[in-house]
Amino acid sequence: MEPVQKLQIPYKSIRLSDGTEYQSYHTEGALSGKQPADYKNGIPAFRKEWIQKRFNHSNHSQMYFAKKGIITEEMRYAAFRENMEPEFVRSEIACGRAILPSNRNHPELEPMIIGKNFLVKINANIGNSTFSSSIEEEVEKLHWAIKWGADTVMDLSTGKNIHETREWILRNSPVPIGTVPIYQALEKVKGKTENLNIQIFLETLEEQAEQGVDYFTIHAGVLLRYIPLTTNRITGIVSRGGSILAKWCQAHHKENFLYTHFDEILKVMKKYGVSISLGDGLRPGSIADANDKAQFSELETLGELTQLAWKEDIQVMIEGPGHVPMNLIKENVDLQTKICQEAPFYTLGPIVTDIAPGYDHITSAIGAAMIGWYGTAMLCYVTPKEHLGLPNKEDVKQGVIAYKIAAHAADLAKGHPGAIDRDNLLSKARFEFRWEDQFSLSLDPETAKTFHDEMLPQDRMKTAHFCSMCGPHFCSMNLTQELRKFAQEKEIQES
């Protein structure tokens, strides 16, 4: 086994004033989340030698190697990041309970694993629209998202220069990149849904896979017979990909071509080692529509497609809702686990109430924490701009932070090894009034420090045994320390 130090596992070292050092899971890559001086230089091709060793294989999926009993360098790397044994990572990938997204043409990738027995991961969406954003802005959004902790990023560009934008996102990304290929396929037919066909879609898949995309969202579960089931919904079909395929099905009175040609899609996946994220094109777009027949009928089909992909050794994760009230969340996980035989669940939130536009990073983080606790492997973030507009940098940060909180809360509830260590260190620093250590251990040190310093900016206040909330005479922790000191002195005197 290759020594850990030679693998250069990307941890962030947090040194505390009491001499303690905490190693934090780190997603920022070689540039530590900073914007490159010139995005056209890209970042180092980290996996180049690993990929070359396996170049002659006909199947480049990590599941293919895992089923053969081979522990790849990527598996070993992901295992060390998780503090797990490499054999455990291999076995989880082999049985389909976890995926390691890693296109052979994305050598810049620092491998990570998605599965319910590992740390809960989060995805951030970026991408331009017809109204705004340049390539430079999207690369900047990428680095901004991973600076705050995004484990994967999806490029959902629908505007100009889709190919070139994706190319430079990939060349600058240390995290897996996902896309929804139907968007670019639609752009190729100038937005005319009825002109889509399997040839155009496969050409688009090949183009994106050749660039290095690590996972594709494929809405192959939107079947012709399911479309009428959405008629009485309040919000109908809210998935962009789902609505595109539904419109095509109705225009031609034919079955979804992604479903009927799924075997051809798998051939592209196998060639490049791309993972499939089976899209929930009929997910509920309002809590009134949650857990309805349309949603769960599609889920049954996704279970069928999962088996087809696994037969070809293709890695699969299943996308989920959406908008779901808290009392219906567990049913989603239980059904997905049963129908899709524990393939990793990847959910958008879910949003638990529809009354808070502008705050849906909060309404969804509540649902995300719950669904992560129940076993969801990856959470797709929601920003404050959800339902309102294209998110800017600050929106991306707020979304990522909200979801890092949700994911960590789920890890704590699941009892993931080591998850509580950071909480304990921060609590100890808080009780001992080590303010700088509190800032360093927080998910957002800049905001924590800013809030503290608003009222108490002086350097001497960095060691003060109070904050501006309670002042020097009403701090419960300071009073507790005095009580303990008094009790210890009394005990010494009596002994």
Curated annotation (Swiss-Prot):
Protein name: Phosphomethylpyrimidine synthase
Pathway as given in its UniProt record: Cofactor biosynthesis; thiamine diphosphate biosynthesis
A Gene Ontology term for the protein's cellular component: cytosol
Species, as recorded: Leptospira interrogans serogroup Icterohaemorrhagiae serovar Lai (strain 56601)
Cofactor: [4Fe-4S] cluster
MF GO annotations: 4 iron, 4 sulfur cluster binding; carbon-carbon lyase activity; zinc ion binding
Signal peptide annotation: none
Protein's job: Catalyzes the synthesis of the hydroxymethylpyrimidine phosphate (HMP-P) moiety of thiamine from aminoimidazole ribotide (AIR) in a radical S-adenosyl-L-methionine (SAM)-dependent reaction.
Pfam families associated with the record: ThiC_Rad_SAM (PF01964)
Protein keywords: 4Fe-4S, Iron, Iron-sulfur, Lyase, Metal-binding, S-adenosyl-L-methionine, Thiamine biosynthesis, Zinc
Sequence positions that bind substrate: 125, 154, 183, 219, 239-241, 280-283, 319, 346
Annotated GO biological process: thiamine biosynthetic process; thiamine diphosphate biosynthetic process
PANTHER family: PHOSPHOMETHYLPYRIMIDINE SYNTHASE, CHLOROPLASTIC, THIAMINE BIOSYNTHESIS PROTEIN THIC
UniProt key word Zinc: yes
Reaction(s) catalysed by this chain's protein: 5-amino-1-(5-phospho-beta-D-ribosyl)imidazole + S-adenosyl-L-methionine = 4-amino-2-methyl-5-(phosphooxymethyl)pyrimidine + CO + 5'-deoxyadenosine + formate + L-methionine + 3 H(+)
Sites where the protein binds Zn(2+): 323, 387
